[in-house]
């Protein structure tokens, strides 16, 4: 049911962003009778619109606005204008995610207590824990129809997984399976089971993979309490003399500016845009940015310790067939400092098409050694490494006043330096990943550097004390009581697990 709210209606809740955080929140509020206006910077695409072409899809759904990078991380060298790969559109990055849906482990909520003082890291215990989150995890798993939870069967393993599983078992790994995935393993109502056509990063053409865009938003809209305004870029959050937020200034598709009044504002623009909006909302009352009395807005940016390992074999694997992320090894996700680092990591199968493989296998690579790897694409298997990176106050999102966007506002700069713990963990993971493939006869292995970040975390972190973060355990900002954050920027620490289920 379509609805349009008056821009002067100050009884609405404005949600900025419609991804896993904002989209679900907007829909849930609408179902409870709350009037919601969701401002979405991008357009709207459903399964019928997605294209099975990696670069065409990248242009179709990605957030490509101007951004800059700094720091010693490899991404700043290889992709200086693309620090992250996120979606600009209804559903946010749940449109292109692989679907891995994992719970934090108990110790990962209390890393300051468990890991102790790690030099150079700004570790902090979350103000919530496993017991608080378990019932919400169960609700989320049911909503997302996560496989291998709630009695739901797992997805079948493709060839990429079979190679991965065989190598894992030869190494003695015990916890290897086809993962907990927000991808239908059977038909549900109007959503079919996964058809194993692959290329999940380009959007699910069947609608079998959960997305806030086509699973949650339509439910909220059907109540008559949710209006989604597409191509509406939030520019600034306004407040009154008491410091209470009163609305959001945004620009429409034609660049015309509007103000939507609100009684509550929820920021859910991902961990780069959310702090950027708060910083761009600076005023005489909030000179360092809205809700930033602690100076923590933008700080403690995390993106997970990542990398990939690919391998070639003497027989075809055809890794692109079936789900992009078809299996997981969780044995290394434990906290075991004897390995030379705190925290842990997951190994997850991954498949890229030839266009992406050419760009990401060895950025800047050339010559026969590089091209011969691509020649063996049909015989290639692949995995992604994802582990807990250390929060650091100096890893942060700031405003780049030298580069303005199409609306005349400073663009975000993402600064990231790898912590020594991240480097030690990545090297360990490269070794173990290669060993998995060597155990089953790999002819070559290829440790691959991190891609532009898909797991953007921190920058508005959750804390018990106002001085240590930006929001409390409810996502409510410490400084402004009717301003909330509802995305991965709340994360106090990153854990080893993919973040969407927790968001």
Predicted regions, residues:
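Conserved redox-cofactor binding core of oxidoreductases
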Residues: 62-63, 76-77, 113-234
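Glycine-rich Rossmann-fold phosphate-binding loop(s) that bind the pyrophosphate
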Residues: 17-19, 41, 488
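FAD cofactor-binding and catalytic pocket of flavoenzymes
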Residues: 78-85, 90-93, 126-127, 294-412, ...
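A glycine-rich dinucleotide-binding beta-alpha-beta segment and adjacent secondary-structure elements
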Residues: 179, 193-200, 235-238, 379-389, ...
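Conserved hydrophobic helix-helix packing surfaces used for dimerization/oligomerization
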Residues: 13-15, 36, 265, 483
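Glycine-rich loop(s) and the adjacent beta-strand/alpha-helix scaffold that form part
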Residues: 28-31, 35, 42-54, 223, ...
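Beta1/beta-strand and adjacent pyrophosphate-binding region of the FAD-binding site
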Residues: 5-21
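Redox-cofactor-proximal catalytic regions of oxidoreductases
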Residues: 57-153, 314, 386, 393, ...
């Amino acid at each position: 049911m379509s609805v349009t709210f008056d821009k002067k209606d100050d009884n609405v809740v404005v949600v900025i962003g419609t991804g896993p955080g904002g989209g679900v929140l907007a829909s849930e509020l609408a179902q409870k009778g709350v009037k919601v206006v969701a401002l979405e910077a991008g357009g709207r695409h459903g399964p019928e619109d997605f294209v099975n072409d990696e670069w065409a899809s990248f242009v179709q759904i990605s957030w490509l606005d101007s951004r800059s990078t700094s720091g010693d991380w490899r991404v700043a060298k290889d992709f200086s204008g693309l620090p992250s790969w996120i979606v600009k559109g209804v559903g946010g990055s749940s449109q292109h995610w692989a679907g891995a849906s994992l719970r934090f482990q108990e110790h990962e909520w209390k890393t300051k207590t468990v890991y102790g003082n790690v030099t150079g890291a700004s570790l902090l215990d979350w103000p919530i824990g496993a017991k608080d989150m378990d019932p919400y995890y169960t609700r989320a798993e049911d909503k997302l129809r996560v496989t291998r939870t709630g009695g739901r069967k797992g997805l079948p393993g493709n060839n990429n997984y079979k190679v991965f599983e065989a190598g894992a078992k030869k190494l003695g790994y015990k916890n290897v399976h086809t993962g907990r995935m927000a991808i239908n393993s059977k038909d549900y109502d109007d959503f079919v089971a996964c058809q194993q056509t692959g290329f999940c990063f380009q959007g699910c053409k069947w609608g079998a993979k959960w997305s806030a865009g086509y699973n949650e938003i339509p439910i909220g809209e059907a109540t008559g309490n949710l209006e989604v305004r597409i191509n509406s870029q939030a520019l600034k959050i306004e407040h009154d003399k008491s410091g209470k937020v009163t609305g959001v200034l945004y620009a429409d598709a034609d660049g015309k500016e509007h103000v939507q009044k609100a009684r509550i504002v929820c920021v859910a623009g991902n961990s780069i845009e959310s702090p950027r909006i708060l910083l761009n909302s600076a005023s005489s009352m909030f000179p360092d940015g809205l809700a930033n009395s602690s100076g923590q807005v933008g700080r403690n940016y995390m993106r997970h310790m990542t990398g990939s390992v690919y391998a070639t074999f003497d027989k075809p694997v055809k890794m692109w067939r079936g789900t992009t992320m078809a299996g997981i090894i969780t044995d290394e996700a434990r906290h075991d400092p004897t390995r030379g680092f705190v925290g842990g990591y997951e190994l997850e199968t991954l498949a890229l098409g030839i266009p992406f493989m050419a760009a990401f296998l060895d950025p800047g690579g050339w010559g026969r050694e590089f091209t011969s790897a691509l020649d063996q694409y049909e015989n290639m298997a692949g995995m992604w490494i994802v582990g807990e990176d250390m929060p650091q106050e100096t890893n942060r999102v700031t405003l780049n006043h030298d580069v303005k966007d199409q609306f005349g506002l400073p663009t975000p700069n993402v600064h990231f330096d790898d912590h020594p713990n991240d480097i030690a963990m990545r090297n360990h993971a490269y070794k173990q990943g290669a060993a998995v493939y060597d155990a089953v006869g790999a002819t070559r292995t290829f440790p691959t550097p991190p891609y532009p970040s898909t797991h953007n975390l921190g920058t508005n972190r959750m804390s018990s004390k106002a001085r240590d973060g930006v929001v409390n355990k409810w996502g409510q900002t410490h400084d402004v009581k009717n301003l909330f954050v509802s995305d991965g920027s709340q994360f106090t620490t990153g854990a080893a697990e993919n973040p969407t289920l927790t968001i």
